[in-house]
Amino acid sequence: MAVPAALILRESPSMKKAVSLINAIDTGRFPRLLTRILQKLHLKAESSFSEEEEEKLQAAFSLEKQDLHLVLETISFILEQAVYHNVKPAALQQQLENIHLRQDKAEAFVNTWSSMGQETVEKFRQRILAPCKLETVGWQLNLQMAHSAQAKLKSPQAVLQLGVNNEDSKSLEKVLVEFSHKELFDFYNKLETIQAQLDSLT
């Protein structure tokens, strides 16, 4: 006896409205919309469509801006749930039928998920495991005068400049971290510990 799929989609009022809007979308254009959203799903910081593209979608699907956003958000939510639960295509179709999505739209979801689902799940895994990658390291020394007029000693500070690559933005972000002598020494010791553990695994 087959185990029923966990309920991942519920018929809330907003879901019901979104389903009625999705059911009315031109079936010929719908698969391309799904493909685009699924391709960009793992890029949280990046919208699936530009403002200009959204205006074209409004005209193509005869939707108000608010309704278009509800449709796009609902499609993204359905696909995110599919990724999170790593559902099989047949289970996804069952879920979509439960929320009364028309058969042609449900089949478009299932076909898109069948061809791109596992690739998308893998992209999410990579994003969770390695959201940022260290690309560059720079450093400099700063000498700060003590605030007390009686204290003439300067306090040296090391400044590390880390260039990290974020997959969401595809751009290099510079992070500045300032260390006192003690903080840098503690940081060095932690790096030594990490290096020793890495060496023991290789």
From Swiss-Prot:
Phosphoserine found at: S155
Keyword Nucleus in record: yes
Subcellular location: Cytoplasm; Nucleus
Positions of the COMM domain: 133-202
Keyword Nucleus applies: yes
This protein's GO CC annotations: cytoplasm; nucleoplasm
One Pfam match: COMM_domain
Transmembrane spans: none
Tissue spec. comment: Ubiquitous.
Modified residues (N-acetylalanine): A2
This protein's UniProt keywords: Acetylation, Cytoplasm, Nucleus, Phosphoprotein, Transcription, Transcription regulation, Ubl conjugation pathway
Subunit structure: Component of the commander complex consisting of the CCC subcomplex and the retriever subcomplex. Component of the CCC (COMMD/CCDC22/CCDC93) subcomplex consisting of COMMD1, COMMD2, COMMD3, COMMD4, COMMD5, COMMD6, COMMD7, COMMD8, COMMD9, COMMD10, CCDC22 and CCDC93; within the complex forms a heterodimer with COMMD5. Interacts with RELA, RELB, NFKB1/p105, NFKB2/p100. Interacts with CCDC22, CCDC93, SCNN1B, CUL1, CUL2, CUL3, CUL4A, CUL4B, CUL7.
PANTHER family: COMM DOMAIN CONTAINING PROTEIN 10 (PTHR12333), COMM DOMAIN-CONTAINING PROTEIN 10 (PTHR12333:SF0)
Protein's job: Scaffold protein in the commander complex that is essential for endosomal recycling of transmembrane cargos; the commander complex is composed of the CCC subcomplex and the retriever subcomplex. May modulate activity of cullin-RING E3 ubiquitin ligase (CRL) complexes. May down-regulate activation of NF-kappa-B.
Sequence similarity: Belongs to the COMM domain-containing protein 10 family.
Protein name: COMM domain-containing protein 10
Gene: COMMD10
